[in-house]
Design a protein with these regions (language model features):
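Active-site rim/loop-helix segments in enzyme catalytic domains that contact anionic ligands
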Residues: 1-112, 138-143
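Metal-dependent de-N-acetylase/amidase catalytic core
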Residues: 1-15, 94-229
Length: 229
């Protein structure tokens, strides 16, 4: 086993690029926490306010509620800056990719980032907005000379979630996974609870966290020849 496979890249500044408020916690939370524990600064670029979610754990205007939830979760995770944009939830695929990428370029330059962290190109849950947010980061990366690291699921976890919940979960075979890291989920769990409109009992989130245990799985999407690793 490659010893480096269990260590995150030694980045001092990371930009997480996501589609919705809660993606930074439900999806990337434990990895963000691990980067921060290693001394990195982490910023988040979130393209939508998540106003189209069908999960409504609280009453009220969902876009406004979820903006507040994201702010609270970011504080718990230790995120430095959140860039929250107002693209339509569920409509990122219709937005100009180069325009989305420009936002990622700007945020990465603002924080002098060493790399970007995203959802896998599968979108993990098959959500088209997840796929589009990742594409924006992948387009931006070579223009700022950055690597892109993707959070993914191993096939066995995705298959079990699919069997139990009939959702569109998409994993990767072990040969396509570059990192298996041990994580402490304490900050992630606290951040998840900052999203009461979405962290509803019995949702796929809880079953996924149970199946993953204290591990997360990552793969390279973009490697620059001269980028820091």
């Amino acid at each position: 086993v490659n010893e480096e496979r269990g260590k995150l890249p030694a980045w001092s500044s990371v930009l997480a690029v996501v589609a919705h408020p809660d993606d930074e916690s439900f999806g990337l939370g434990a990895v963000i926490s691990a980067f921060i524990d290693a001394g990195a600064r982490v910023d988040v670029l979130c393209f939508t306010k998540g106003e189209a979610s069908t999960l409504r754990g609280v009453e009220g205007d969902l876009g406004t509620i979820r903006r507040g939830e994201l702010t609270a979760a970011a504080r718990e995770l230790g995120i430095t800056t959140v860039h929250l944009l107002d693209y339509p939830d569920g409509g990122l695929t219709d937005e100009d990719l180069s325009e989305l990428a420009e936002h990622a370029i700007g945020a990465a330059r603002d924080a002098a980032c060493d790399g970007m962290l995203v959802f896998d190109t599968t979108g993990i849950t098959g959500h088209a907005d997840h796929v589009r947010a990742t594409k924006a980061a992948v387009v931006a990366a070579p223009l700022v000379g950055l690597d892109v690291l993707a959070w993914t699921l191993p096939d066995e976890v995705a298959d079990e979630l699919h069997a139990k919940l009939h959702g569109d979960f998409r994993g990767r075979p072990s040969k396509d996974i570059d990192f298996v890291i041990e994580v402490n989920r304490q900050r992630q769990q606290t951040a998840v609870h900052c999203h009461p409109s979405q962290a509803v009992p019995g949702s796929a989130l809880w079953q996924r966290l149970d199946l993953l245990g204290d591990r997360e799985y990552l793969r390279w999407l973009v490697r620059q020849e001269n980028a820091a690793t």
